Each structure stands twice: as C-alpha cells, then as structure tokens.
Amino acid sequence: MSDRYPVLEGAEPFYFEGSRVGILVSHGFTGSTQSMRPLGEAYAEEGYTVCGPRLKGHGTHYEDMEQSTYQDWIASIEEGFQWLKERCDTIFVTGLSMGGTLTLYMAEKYPEIRGIVLINAAIEIPAMEPVLQLEGTRFLDAIGSDIKKTGVTELAYEKTPVKSVKEILTFMKDVKKDLPKVSCPALIFVSDEDHVVPPDNSQTIYGLISSEIKEIQDLKESYHVATLDNDQKTIIEETLKFIKRIL
C-alpha cells in the first residue's frame, strides 16, 4: 500500500479464524470489502474461517486503481486463498459482481474448491464495450452503489478509470471462455433488476459451467449490490444452507 493512497475506513481486508472449513469472500469492481463484510461476519458467526481480501487498487483512490491490472486483482484473491489453505481443509468461494468473475476464475483454476456462490457475477457488460475505443479519457462516471434499499451507500469510487474498464473487459472474456472448466457445485444469485451487470449473465454462466449441482436464485428486492440491499438476509441464509448441503 502506498502512503499516498491510505485505505479508506471500512475498506480494510477482514479475517476471521474458525473451523477447518473456509470461505473466501470477494468484493467487486471499484468497490470495497464493505460490500461483503456483513456476509463475512455472518459466516464467521456460524463458525467458519473467513477471508475477505481487499483487491489491489481498491478501497483507496481511483487513481490507485488506475495503476492496477486484472492480474493484480487475481493475485489479491489468491493471497486470500493461500491464507485459508493454511488453516482449512475445505474452501468455498463467493463473490459479488467482478468478485463473482474472480470466483469463477478460481473455480476454473483450482478444482479442489468445494463450491462457489455467485452474486450478480459479471462475464459480459455490453455497455462497457465502447470504452475500448476511448482515447484520451482517463475517468468515467461512478458505477457503484446500485442499491434499491433507501439510505444505504456502497463504499465505492466516485470515478471509474478507463484503463480499469479495459482490464475487466479482458478478464471477463478470458473467464467466460473457460467456464466449462467449472465443475464444483454452484449457487447463483441474480437480481431481477440490475443497472450494472445484465441479469442474463447469470443464465449464461449457469448454461456454460459443467457443474452437476447448480441452481439459480432470483433476488426480487435488490439491485446490483445485493449484499447491502433488501435481499442480504436471503443471500446469507441460502449460502449457509448450500454449504451445509455440500459438506
């Protein structure tokens, strides 16, 4: 971490030591661990060991994010995975938005992952594609805080680096191509109304992964950041049920 970009309050990584079953929790693009902390705390209360890494360039300043690549974001998640592997025999991975993309990447690369839980996971965002043609523009408007529940704000950047959008577009394409490699059990949450990631991403993921055990659950009362929205309790309860079924 550079001193020039201190970590924002609430955006710190979180770690909870518990049982030999671990849960890796990933936040999304331009967001922070704040969006996943309620889930991490709930899983820790159930006795699980939980790790919520802060993705490189996130939870600081958008100019810091501009310097990071999707390989950096993968490295952040893999560090968390290693932390859990030192403490756990069984690991589940869950992620929101690009955190879901990272979750899919991990399941493609590490077949030992016991199960995954995706929340509005991203593999193609057509609205972002024109950014590939942009030259000379560094920052776009914010994409964070797409939440239906009143009075709730996501701790996310007020601007989106163009360079970072190009990174996520490349990353999503790579992950989509390898989706058939995902064979572990998968629980897929999708908001009916999402202003960031088109809900049909979840249907595509469901269709392309090779998992025998897979299910989609609709979230009717939440927008994109469902982990901070009206369906937060549903996500937590259904995830815990899913994990207990798989173990």
Model-flagged regions — what are they?
Residues Q203, G207-V225:
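Catalytic histidine neighborhood in serine/cysteine hydrolases
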Residues H195-N201:
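Conserved alpha/beta-hydrolase "acid-adjacent" motif
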Residues V182, I188-V190, D194:
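Short beta-strand/loop motif that positions the catalytic acidic residue
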Residues G95-G99, T103:
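Gly/Ala-rich beta-loop-alpha elbow adjacent to hydrolase catalytic centers
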